[in-house]
Swiss-Prot record:
Location in or out of the cell: Cellular thylakoid membrane
Subunit structure as annotated in this protein's UniProt entry: PSII is composed of 1 copy each of membrane proteins PsbA, PsbB, PsbC, PsbD, PsbE, PsbF, PsbH, PsbI, PsbJ, PsbK, PsbL, PsbM, PsbT, PsbX, PsbY, Psb30/Ycf12, peripheral proteins PsbO, CyanoQ (PsbQ), PsbU, PsbV and a large number of cofactors. It forms dimeric complexes.
Predominant localisation class: membrane
Gene for this chain: psbT
Protein name in the entry: Photosystem II reaction center protein T
Source organism (scientific name): Prochlorococcus marinus (strain MIT 9313)
Positions of transmembrane segments: 3-23
Top-level taxon of origin: Bacteria
Annotated GO biological process: photosynthesis
Family, similarity comment: Belongs to the PsbT family.
Gene Ontology CC annotation, any one: photosystem II reaction center
Function: Found at the monomer-monomer interface of the photosystem II (PS II) dimer, plays a role in assembly and dimerization of PSII. PSII is a light-driven water plastoquinone oxidoreductase, using light energy to abstract electrons from H(2)O, generating a proton gradient subsequently used for ATP formation.
Keywords: Membrane, Photosynthesis, Photosystem II, Thylakoid, Transmembrane, Transmembrane helix
Stored Pfam families: PsbT
UniProt membrane topology term: Single-pass membrane protein
Length: 35
């Protein structure tokens, strides 16, 4: 199942990027989303 492995890998990459951004720059959603 290469498709399954590829999907799992993409999910891990996206999750890693999301958490990296979230922890680097704490969420200010609604307050200053213009920047």
């Amino acid at each position: 199942m290469d498709a399954f492995a590829y999907t799992l890998l993409m999910t891990l990459v996206v999750a890693t990027l999301f958490f990296a951004v979230a922890f680097r720059d704490p969420p200010k959603i609604g307050k200053d989303s213009g920047k």
